[in-house]
């Protein structure tokens, strides 16, 4: 569904990929990334995040945690990644990118928690329950620091992809925060969900999910309990044109992924500031029957 958009909005990239393939410099069955455009897209996202007071972490899994991709993103000022699993953390770490957020969507396995803390020291570590919070805090204590813990929360009516369900009950967030503050090596830092924004096929627009309202209510409950500096992590279908709305809803963190290479569903519907900058290269192997 992106081919027409790619050819119209970034034709020189398509032509360059074809030329390099014809010169046998890029094989068939390859993904090709326009690193110059990635850097430009990342710069747009970073600028809009800064304008709205949002911390920004780059999602890199969609392009295989490519080190060249990571370096282009860092060149635009986005210095930290969100690692949905240890593979992401290792890949971005090797590329020289610090891990800003670890453990969301995949929880860090108990046997890998110590290595995650010692090697990556993520700014934030998401946990879905008290057991995982204890493991993260214990690992951080062994590594000699206090880990900022984000709590994945949920409420009735929230929307999750299959296999992504779970988290602390949003109604219990104040008590959860108190418990996490009691962990050696850990401290409660804030709340998260996924997805906070989602493309609506009927209206062909990106809309807030019920999850974003859940985050807002939980943040209000924490503020009413006297807590300040609450981090609100709100990923999902992120483009620069949506950041102002996220900030107005109370978000403090955003995590663009497909937006960095201009391939969210909204990029198909509208010409957004980010241009498409990734393609799959193949070739016609032979003709048969005319």
PLM segments and residue spans:
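Generic N-terminal amphipathic, Lys/Arg-enriched alpha-helix
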Residues: 1, 12-33
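N-terminal glycine-rich anion-binding loops that anchor highly charged ligand groups
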Residues: 14-18, 38-62
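Flexible, glycine- and charge-enriched loops at secondary-structure boundaries
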Residues: 31, 35, 126, 166, ...
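Active-site-proximal beta-alpha core segment in soluble small-molecule metabolic enzymes
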Residues: 57-193, 197-199
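Active-site loop/helix belt of alpha/beta enzymes
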Residues: 155-272
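Charged (often Lys/Glu-rich) extended helix/loop segments that serve as interaction or gating elements
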Residues: 262-290
């Amino acid at each position: 569904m992106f081919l027409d958009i790619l050819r119209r909005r970034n034709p020189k990239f398509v032509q360059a990929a074809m030329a390099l393939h014809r010169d046998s410099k890029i094989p068939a069955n390859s993904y090709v990334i326009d690193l110059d455009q990635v850097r430009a897209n990342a710069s747009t996202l970073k600028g809009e995040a800064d304008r709205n007071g949002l911390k920004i972490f780059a999602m890199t899994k969609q392009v295989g945690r490519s080190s060249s991709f990571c370096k282009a993103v860092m060149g635009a000022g986005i210095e930290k990644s969100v690692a949905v699993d240890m593979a992401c953390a290792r890949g971005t770490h090797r590329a020289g990118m610090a891990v800003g957020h670890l453990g969301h969507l995949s929880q860090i396995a108990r046997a890998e928690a110590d290595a995650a803390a010692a090697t990556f020291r993520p700014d934030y570590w998401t946990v879905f329950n008290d057991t995982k919070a204890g493991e993260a805090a214990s690992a951080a204590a062994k590594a000699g620091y206090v880990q900022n813990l984000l709590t994945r929360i949920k409420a009735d009516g929230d929307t999750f992809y299959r296999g992504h369900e779970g988290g602390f009950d949003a109604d219990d967030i104040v008590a959860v925060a108190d418990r996490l503050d009691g962990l050696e090596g850990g401290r409660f830092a804030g709340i998260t969900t996924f997805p906070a924004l989602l493309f609506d096929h009927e209206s062909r627009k990106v809309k807030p999910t019920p999850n974003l309202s859940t985050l807002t209510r939980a943040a209000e409950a924490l503020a009413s309990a006297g807590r300040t500096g609450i981090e609100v992590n709100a990923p999902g279908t992120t483009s620069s044109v949506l950041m102002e709305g996220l900030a107005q809803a109370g978000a403090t963190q955003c995590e663009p992924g497909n937006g960095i290479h201009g391939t969210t569903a909204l990029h198909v519907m509208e010409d957004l500031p980010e241009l498409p900058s990734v393609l799959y290269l193949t070739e016609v192997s032979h003709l048969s029957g005319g």
